[in-house]
Amino acid sequence: MKMILLKIIVLLSFLLMIYMNYLANSKPLGGISTGDISAKYNTMFTPSGFTFSIWGIIYLLVLVFVIVFVTAQTGALPNMSLLGILFVVSCVLNIGWLLCWHFDKILASTLVMILFLITLLSILEFTSPEGITYITFSVYFG
C-alpha cells in the first residue's frame, strides 16, 4: 500500500472514530448514552463516572500520534506501515464496539473489545519504547 494512501486512511479512521464517539453521547446511538448502558449493567469493576474523563487525554494523545504519523517521512517510524494498519483496525474495532454496546449486543461487544485490546497490544509490541507512539498506546491500552 502506498504510504500516502495509508496516511489518508489513518487520518480518516481517526476522524470517524472521534465522530462516532461524539455521536454515541450527543445523539445517543440506539437511544441511550454509553454511560447509561454502563449504569444499566451493575458490575463490581465499573469505575466511577469521573474516571471516564481519561478519554479526553487518551484521544488527545491519539491525535498527537496521528499528526506524527501523517507528517512523518516514509520509514521515519519503526514498522510504520504495520502501525498504520493496526491503528486503522483499532479505530474500526472502537467503532464496532460502540455499535455493539449501544444496541445491547453485550456478547458481541465483549468479543470486539477483546480484539480491540489485542490490537492495542500488537501496536505496543511493534513500537519502540522511547517514542510518543509508545506513550500514546501505553496510556490507551491502560
List each model region and its residues.
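Hydrophobic alpha-helical transmembrane segments in multi-pass integral membrane proteins
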Residues: 48-68
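Membrane-interface helix caps and helix-loop-helix hairpins in membrane proteins
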Residues: 96-109, 127-132
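Membrane-interfacial loop-to-transmembrane alpha-helix junctions, especially the N-terminal start
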Residues: 77-87
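Alpha-helical transmembrane segments of multi-pass integral membrane proteins
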Residues: 12-19, 86-93, 97, 112-123, ...
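Alpha-helical transmembrane segments of multi-pass membrane proteins
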Residues: 14-31
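Short aromatic-rich membrane-water interface segments that cap or initiate transmembrane helices
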Residues: 39-54, 133-140
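N-terminal membrane topogenic signal
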Residues: 1-10, 55
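Structural signal for the C-terminal ends of transmembrane alpha-helices
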Residues: 67-74, 123-128
